[in-house]
From Swiss-Prot:
Residues of the S4 RNA-binding domain: 97-158
Protein name stated in the entry: Small ribosomal subunit protein uS4
Function: One of the primary rRNA binding proteins, it binds directly to 16S rRNA where it nucleates assembly of the body of the 30S subunit.
Region (Disordered) residue spans: 31-56
GO cellular component: small ribosomal subunit
Compositional bias of kind Basic and acidic residues: 31-40
Feature: compositional bias, Polar residues: 42-53
Amino acid sequence: MARYLGPKAKLARREGTDLFLKSARRALSDKCRLDNKPGQDGRTSGSRTSDYGNQLREKQKVKRIYGVLERQFRRYFAEAERRKGNTGETLLQLLESRLDNVVYRMGFGSTRAEARQLVSHCAILLNGNPVNIPSIQVKPGDVVAIREKAKKQARITESLNLVGQMAAVTWVSVDVAKLEGTFKQVPDREDISGEINESLIVELYSR
């Protein structure tokens, strides 16, 4: 399955919520009616979505938020199921601990896609070493930094300025002057978006 390269607003409308695929400088406009699915043109459907349909939609939504493909997502779920604790919560923690997501949470990328691109282009250091694998799992205490040759990129400065206007997450710390941050801890469930119902995903894979 290839990555979706079409309009981001269309995906947000399909899932009925902002997937944070667009940066704050190009946020979803008022014209993007999230309560209207693509092709509805304002009309509502008389059919109800089945339990399976709701579960599938929730999985698709989370995959799109984190930019993960189906095979990868299944591996994350299998790993979450293998570990002790709440499977759904562990799944989200694994996704939040991806390097591209941590780069995004630290404000170095205005979207996860932009953060993923920074990693793929070797613009990121992990504990002082250059890396280019977005899916690397970051551990508590790990230091993520912008490589010297990438520090002058305007998009990084713009992204940090935008993040400064929003509430920062508490489980990472960022030194803006040094363009580096520390992954302090794996986030608790309450630190992760409440727009996700991970129990539906667990139900889907338990069928």
